[in-house]
Amino acid sequence: ENKFTDYDLYVVDNASTDGAPDAIRDKYGDKVKLIVNKENLGGSGGFNTGLRVAYKEGYEYLMCVDNDAMLDENAIGNLCKFLEEHDEVGMAASKIYHLEAPDYIQQFGQTIDFEYFCTDVPHLDMYEDGSMPDYLYVDSVAACSLMIRRSTIDKIGFMPEENFLYWDDTEWCYLCNKAGMKVASVGTSKALHAMGAKRETVNTFPTYYAWRNWINFFVKYTPEKDLDRMTDTFLNSMFQIVYEGLHNGEYNRAKTVMLAYDDAIHGITGKAGENRIFELDFNETPFRELFESAQSFFINENNHPVMAERVRLLAQNFGYDINWCERAEADV
């Protein structure tokens, strides 16, 4: 239960179809201020719906929390305290852990790399052993548990909505740093995050937005002298993913990547248009043949427990059991 009590809670329903608004009203009544969007405005649009209402109410600090995030009892209070004590910081976020592996880091800040035109999460999948700094000043943080000053919004605006989904928080943080304010990831504020929306499980929805908005970001902010290198990076990356998709029989993924690239270079933003997102056509044959080739398999986590768990679940879907192994070496 949250130990910090000096706050008001706004819940934004982003045009859900499962009866969530009625369920929230029935369970929480006046304890939360419910806002129901008439259409799905994406991650950034959903956040901004609530942020704009809260901003008009005059709050000095505003916070974004994803629906698939679970906050530690001190998460909100410690972010507020950190901002109170660090005037140079424009926004601060929790230290994020994997929901399915709570002892391992999902994000403790992110770097934006204009040398290789990518982002990097330095602490991804690291085990929490208590040796990390109390906080870090970083290029960007995840918006799944993020607090921002009202004065920061005055300078850089609300979250960029043209992305619809993905890269919106990265761009927001980039603008914060560019405006002369720091972005912090705070270790004393902890949150668990499922991160389910970023996995391809049904269709190529995450692939489209991740690729299009990745390209859009660097096209927008890369210095002119580096544009040729940037273009080479995009084309090489696209060739690799498309080639692998065609080779593995994942034609819809390859198609989505090419369409995302085309939309990006033509400046198309917002919600994906028609014929951009397709059902997955995953080719399971190579994996099934791998599992059938031996009587037993072992997985060495090698500090990547989340990936190891996904391999185990894949085998389980094929009807095979995989034994966990703590040896330094493993068969798989």
Each language-model region and where it sits:
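A conserved acidic beta->alpha catalytic loop
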Residues: D13-D22, E39
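Short, acidic, metal-binding catalytic loop of nucleotide-sugar glycosyltransferases
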Residues: E1-D6
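Glycine-rich, basic loop-to-helix element that forms the pyrophosphate-binding segment
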Residues: V36-E57
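A short, conserved alpha-helix in the catalytic core of glycosyltransferases
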Residues: D139-F158, E162-K190
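Acidic/His-rich active-site region of diverse nucleotide-sugar glycosyltransferases
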Residues: G45-G46, M70-I156, E162
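Short beta-strand-to-loop acidic/aromatic patch adjacent to the donor-nucleotide binding site
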Residues: Y59-M70
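Terminal low-complexity segments of carbohydrate-biosynthetic enzymes
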Residues: R212-N213, K220, L235-V332
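Active-site-adjacent helix/loop segment of glycosyltransferases
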Residues: L136, K182-I265
